[in-house]
Swiss-Prot record:
Disulfide linkage: none
EC number assigned by the record: 6.3.5.-
NCBIfam families xref list: gatB, PRK05477.1-2, PRK05477.1-4, PRK05477.1-5
Keywords, ordered alphabetically: ATP-binding, Ligase, Nucleotide-binding, Protein biosynthesis
Quaternary structure (record): Heterotrimer of A, B and C subunits.
GO biological process, one term: translation
Gene: gatB
Recorded catalytic activity of this chain's protein: L-glutamyl-tRNA(Gln) + L-glutamine + ATP + H2O = L-glutaminyl-tRNA(Gln) + L-glutamate + ADP + phosphate + H(+); L-aspartyl-tRNA(Asn) + L-glutamine + ATP + H2O = L-asparaginyl-tRNA(Asn) + L-glutamate + ADP + phosphate + 2 H(+)
Domain of life from the UniProt record: Bacteria
SUPFAM superfamilies according to UniProt: GatB/YqeY motif, Glutamine synthetase/guanido kinase
Gene3D superfamilies, sorted: 1.10.10.410, GatB domain, N-terminal subdomain
Family that this chain belongs to: Belongs to the GatB/GatE family. GatB subfamily.
GO molecular function, one term: ATP binding
UniProt-recorded name of the protein: Aspartyl/glutamyl-tRNA(Asn/Gln) amidotransferase subunit B
Lineage: Bacteria, Pseudomonadati, Pseudomonadota, Alphaproteobacteria, Hyphomicrobiales
Length: 490
């Protein structure tokens, strides 16, 4: 099968066009109260070494005990990724020395992971969609944290994070641009949050990305890849890929060769730096952990977890398009966060879905973004916004008045219907009152009347003047109809 090559995704070098090939390894911290093999807390923060059990500290004679909730969360995630769930998997020891790895090895999964192949459908900013293959998902322990800035001559180790369960989600090298990579991580984070298996908080390190980047001439075999470790924001993922691809292209066009290595991205300097030569699997001397039996469960266990899964973003998006008549773009915006989708659904229930979506996306999200607030922190409840949509639909207020009403509810709260009554915000629907205002505007502007007959677009000016004269309360449809009639405009 010929691989797709999108000319828009190619990077122009000094001599040739180049294709960047990207694979991702996402480390997602499992949402659970205790660690993968101990009962110590997974709470973020706290004093250094506050949440450390004897198992986490690798004290002699301490044996790991599997946390079943972490297993269930991994299976839920696999199901959410439409992946093969392996009924038998094995924990292995990954051997390497690092100061914040007290055992001298990490308990991970190598040959027999808990989750096999799956896929993620990713919507791109340009409206296209791609399918990214998932190679595997395995469980492993997180390491501790080395602190080098506490003392000029010493380094310290905080083991609070040591032993926390991670899901490493490995994609196939199916991504062909930094935009695709960012969209993939965004979609994966959305799925994890819907499932409740990882909070996706990159600032706290709950989601970290290792990015594998190589470049090649279109149609040629894969190039030598470099791995950029621990990129901790979606924006930085994009920057790291662009920077590393340019570095590799410059070397190749200069006649050099790419060394397979692990690199770090420095966002301050906008460059990647060599960290160490890239290890191969045999360097870690994997072997099954003798302290842990193979992990086995039956299909009934998987089916039980599957039955409890929530509606996921793709299914919710399809339903919003079908049930509420939304565009694919609007539905995509609304399902990007589960809380946003739930809010919209509460507003749209029993109402015009398109009108509800318009108010949620344009007015509410616009205001939240302006103030840097999240949907969970909105001062306008779904019930209040739904009432505003009702008042427009009932003809009680116009769209312009509705925006003023939204501002009042945002700032002061209260029942929108009661506010309209108490502040006299109802739109004028009395044709006689509107006609009087229209007649006054026409009488005061005879020159504009003549111009409007020759240039019908001037109707908008008359509408604006009439709305101004009525304090924005006149029914816009009635104003338009009267003006067209009196000015003789079709």
């Amino acid at each position: 099968m010929t691989e797709r090559v999108d000319p828009k995704k190619l990077i122009k070098g000094g001599l040739h066009d180049w294709e960047v090939v990207i694979g991702m390894e996402i480390h997602a911290q499992v949402t659970s109260r205790s660690k993968l093999f101990s009962g110590a807390s997974t709470a973020f923060g706290g004093e250094p070494n506050d949440h450390v059990s004897l198992v986490d500290a690798a004290m002699p004679g301490m044996l790991p005990v599997i946390n079943e909730e972490c297993i269930a969360q991994a299976v839920r995630t696999g199901l959410g990724l439409k992946a093969q769930i392996n009924l038998r998997s094995v924990f292995d020891r990954k051997n390497y020395f690092y100061p914040d790895l007290p055992q001298g090895y990490q308990i991970s999964q190598y040959k027999d992971p808990i989750v096999g192949e799956g896929e993620v459908l990713v919507d791109l900013p340009d409206g296209e969609s791609i399918t990214v293959g998932i190679e595997r998902l395995h469980l492993e322990q997180d390491a501790g944290k080395s602190l080098h800035d506490q003392d000029p001559t010493k380094s310290f180790v905080d083991l609070n994070r040591s032993g926390v369960a991670l899901m490493e989600i490995v994609s196939r090298p199916d991504l062909r641009s930094s935009e695709e990579a960012k969209a993939y991580v965004t979609k994966l984070r959305t799925i994890l949050r819907y499932l409740g298996t990882c909070d996706g908080d990159m600032e706290k390190g709950s989601l970290r990305a290792d990015v594998n980047v190589s470049v090649r001439r279109p149609g040629e075999p894969l190039g030598t890849r470099c791995e950029i470790k621990n990129v901790n924001s979606i924006r930085f993922i994009g920057q790291a890929i662009e920077t590393e691809a340019r570095r590799q292209i410059a070397i190749l066009e200069d006649g050099g060769k790419i060394d397979q290595e692990t690199r770090l991205f420095d966002p301050g300097k906008g460059e990647t730096r060599s960290m160490r030569s890239k290890e191969e699997a045999h360097d870690y001397r994997y072997f099954p952990d003798p302290d842990l039996l193979p992990l086995e469960f039956d299909q009934a266990y998987v089916d039980g977890l599957a039955s409890g899964l929530p509606e996921l973003p793709d299914a919710k998006k399809a339903r919003f398009i079908k049930d509420f008549g939304l565009s694919a773009y609007d539905a995509g915006v609304l399902v990007a966060e589960r809380a946003s989708a739930d809010y919209f659904e509460a507003v749209a229930r029993g109402r015009d879905g398109k009108a509800a979506a318009n108010w949620v996306i344009n007015e509410l999200f616009g205001r939240l973004n302006k103030e840097g607030r999240s949907i969970e922190d909105t001062p306008v409840s779904a019930e209040q916004l739904g009432t505003i949509v009702d008042l427009i639909g009932e003809g009680v207020i116009s769209g312009k008045i509705a925006k003023d009403l939204f501002e009042i509810v945002w700032s002061e709260g209260g029942d929108p219907r009661a506010i309209v009554e108490s502040r006299g915000m109802k739109q004028v629907t009395d044709t006689g009152a509107i006609e009087a205002a229209v007649d006054a505007i026409i009488a005061a502007n005879p020159d504009k009347v003549e111009q409007a007959k020759a240039k019908p677009t001037l109707l908008g000016w008359f509408v604006g003047q009439t709305m101004k004269a009525t304090g924005g309360k006149a029914n816009p449809a009635a104003v338009n109809a009267l003006l067209k009639d009196k000015l003789g405009i079709e």
